[in-house]
Design a protein with these regions (language model features):
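Short beta-strand segments at enzyme active-site cores
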Residues: 7-8, 44-50, 135
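Active-site-adjacent betaalpha module
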Residues: 2-4, 30-41, 58-195
């Protein structure tokens, strides 16, 4: 299994803008933790940044402070930066070609929003033959209230995670994922040493 971590849309809009992420607690801390764990295990990190090209959209406008990556993400090393204009990170980007070139077979989903760009990107990955590990507490969402109804952030997060686990992704916590990648590296080292 050869992984790449996709850090989806961790932009200021979700912290100080119009779309504040409210659930789960610790979402940013967990995103940073998986970025650091991936770096320590030489797992490639792909940072995805959303841009709306339409000037009438009230958020994700290139060049605005809210469009910028969160400083903690921007300050960490990554292997590829992808800019996208639609919810799916594969649409209109070089992501798939880069993953194939790197011989990646598994993508790990972290970032925002669970119900929109993370969910869409995970589904696109499955349709392209990739395995998906969907980080349950390193993704995040917010409550919705629109003409179709309303749903709390907790309910929305739980529903998407349950749907992902059904036939699409392996839903896994940050703690379990970090332990998994560390154990696999240790096992490979022991095998190389003939232990």
């Amino acid at each position: 299994m050869t992984r790449a971590l996709l850090v989806v849309d961790v932009q200021n809009e979700y912290f100080s803008g119009l779309l504040p992420i409210t659930h789960p607690q610790g979402h940013l801390t967990n995103i940073l933790r998986v970025m650091d764990a991936a770096a320590a295990q030489a797992i490639p990190r792909v940072v995805v940044q959303h841009t709306f090209p339409q000037p009438d959209k009230p958020f994700f406008q290139r060049g605005t402070p809210q469009w910028e990556l969160h400083p903690e993400v921007r300050g960490r090393p990554h292997d590829l930066l992808i800019e996208k204009n639609l919810p799916g990170s594969f649409t209109g980007t070089a992501l798939e070609a880069w993953l194939r070139q790197q011989r990646i077979d598994t993508v790990v989903i972290a970032g925002y929003m669970t119900h929109m760009c993370c969910d869409t990107t995970a589904r696109q990955a499955v349709h392209r033959g990739f395995k998906v590990e969907f980080l349950s507490d390193a993704t995040g969402t917010l409550p919705l209230n629109n003409s179709a109804g309303q749903v709390s952030a907790e309910e929305l997060q739980r529903a998407i995670l349950c749907a992902q686990q059904m036939l699409l992704s392996e839903v896994i916590s940050t703690e379990a994922w970090c332990r998994r990648i560390t154990q696999r590296t240790q096992a490979r080292m022991r095998a190389a040493l003939g232990q």
